[in-house]
């Protein structure tokens, strides 16, 4: 499931053309970057449109304003680099702790630039102070209650230590039209959290000797319609978002939505796209890569993807309210999805897949995800060595393991996943050194729930 707007450790690219007649100033790239940040922080549509017109950018001031609403503006923490052709600033949104690097690059004559945002570890001097647990959880509840009072969130939130729940919160409406409130056991859509289940399944099959992470993907998919586009792509690269393969959203997906019912159905629509860079050479989030992993699981196990994860993950962990049933099925209590349109919540159905996939879109509860976290910690699902590899940095910029987002070192280690889409915000974290599991699920747009989960994760005592 695609990450909506900004989600931890995702990459947002915004390209523009700059036309500069004067010779490049020593800090020309930094000047351009700071000019955009100033206009962005002011949330002034006319100023943003004027800036975009001046620098020949595509006219998307509305996109700027939506990102501004998500972040509350950007605070510049430090300058990492400033040359005529490149500037890099460490910034932090005012609404959350998600430190980011924003990089601007210009060509030799200053005619083109790319603004790139990516997640970054904060230096110690910029990290929030740790809090005593009771005070921290009280603050988290207050934040959730405040968001609920302004109708900015609806969902469930859970903090557990060594399997014991320390805090549980739920609020808002699961179904606004029928006035059904959210309950502690309400299932919510998971967006990209399903990638963790897919990765666990692949690693289980590796432990059984049925595959190797360095296997060519094509070895397990002999019927793939465009094998030339899998040349050089390995299972490891799919797991780490380094394959160069692309997404499963956009016009092609919309035009074929009615035919995308099985994982192999996605082949017919997306197999014609070759990797956009040599496999293994870069990082780029790839939902299609996890679709392919799902079909590999089917080929190797002899089961459907859905039957495999149900038998070998959900049942083993005791997850009785987790699945990916088709949207036409009745899932008791499943929260409806709502997206913001003209400042009001509106039912979201257009972006939902026919059913959840190995890339995302299934559903679960905070209680089931706690069980998943405990099954990981206790070794029920993976051996200690497999779990350690899956939850350690495995890609170039060290933000992803095998199907798990990762950050921090030592006592500050965190692994899990975030997911966001229209009408869905899901976050699952394990802090292994503290034996803590954090879960937040919401049926409204990101990132209100995710921000609270990160607020707690970044302040728990070590």
Report each predicted region and the residues it spans.
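Positively charged n-region of N-terminal signal peptides that target proteins for export
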Residues: 1-5
């Amino acid at each position: 499931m695609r990450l909506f707007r900004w989600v931890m450790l995702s990459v947002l690219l915004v390209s523009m053309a700059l036309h500069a007649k004067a010779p490049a100033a020593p800090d020309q790239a930094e000047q351009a970057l700071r000019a955009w940040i100033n206009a962005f922080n002011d949330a002034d549509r006319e100023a943003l449109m004027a800036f975009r017109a001046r620098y020949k950018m595509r006219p998307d001031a509305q996109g700027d304003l939506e990102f501004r609403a998500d972040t509350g503006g950007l605070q510049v923490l430090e300058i990492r680099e400033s040359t005529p052709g490149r500037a890099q600033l460490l910034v932090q949104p005012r609404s959350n702790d998600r430190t980011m690097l924003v990089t601007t690059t210009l060509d030799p004559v200053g005619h083109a630039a790319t603004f790139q945002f990516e997640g970054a570890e904060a230096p110690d001097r910029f990290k929030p102070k740790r809090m005593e647990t009771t005070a921290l959880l009280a603050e988290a509840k207050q934040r959730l209650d405040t968001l609920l009072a302004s109708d900015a969130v609806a969902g469930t939130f859970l903090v557990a230590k060594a399997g014991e729940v320390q805090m549980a919160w739920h609020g808002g409406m699961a179904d606004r039209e029928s006035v059904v409130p959210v309950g502690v056991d309400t299932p919510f859509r998971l967006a990209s959290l399903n990638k963790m289940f897919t990765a666990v399944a692949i690693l289980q099959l590796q432990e059984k000797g049925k595959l190797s992470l360095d296997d060519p993907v094509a070895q397990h998919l002999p019927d793939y319609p465009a094998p030339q586009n899998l040349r050089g792509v390995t299972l490891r690269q799919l797991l780490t978002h380094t394959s160069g393969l692309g997404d499963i959203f956009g016009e092609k997906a919309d035009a074929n939505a009615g035919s995308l019912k099985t994982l192999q159905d996605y082949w017919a629509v997306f197999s014609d796209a070759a990797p956009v860079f040599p496999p293994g050479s870069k990082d780029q989030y790839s939902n299609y890569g996890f679709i392919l992993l799902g079909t590999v699981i089917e080929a190797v196990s002899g089961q459907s993807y859905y039957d495999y994860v149900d038998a070998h993950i959900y049942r083993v962990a005791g997850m009785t309210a987790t699945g990916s049933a088709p949207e036409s099925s009745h899932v008791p209590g499943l929260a409806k999805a709502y997206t913001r349109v003209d400042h009001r919540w509106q039912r979201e159905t257009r972006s939902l897949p026919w059913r959840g996939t190995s890339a995302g879109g299934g559903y679960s509860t905070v209680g089931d995800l706690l069980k998943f976290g405990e099954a990981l910690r206790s070794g029920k699902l993976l051996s200690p060595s497999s779990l350690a590899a899956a939850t350690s940095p495995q890609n170039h910029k060290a933000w992803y393991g095998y199907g798990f987002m990762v950050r921090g070192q030592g006592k500050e280690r965190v692994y899990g996943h975030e997911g966001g889409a229209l009408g869905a915000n899901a976050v699952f974290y394990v802090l292994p050194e503290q034996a803590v599991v954090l879960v937040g699920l919401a049926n409204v747009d990101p990132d209100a729930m995710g921000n609270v989960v990160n607020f707690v994760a970044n302040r728990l005592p070590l």
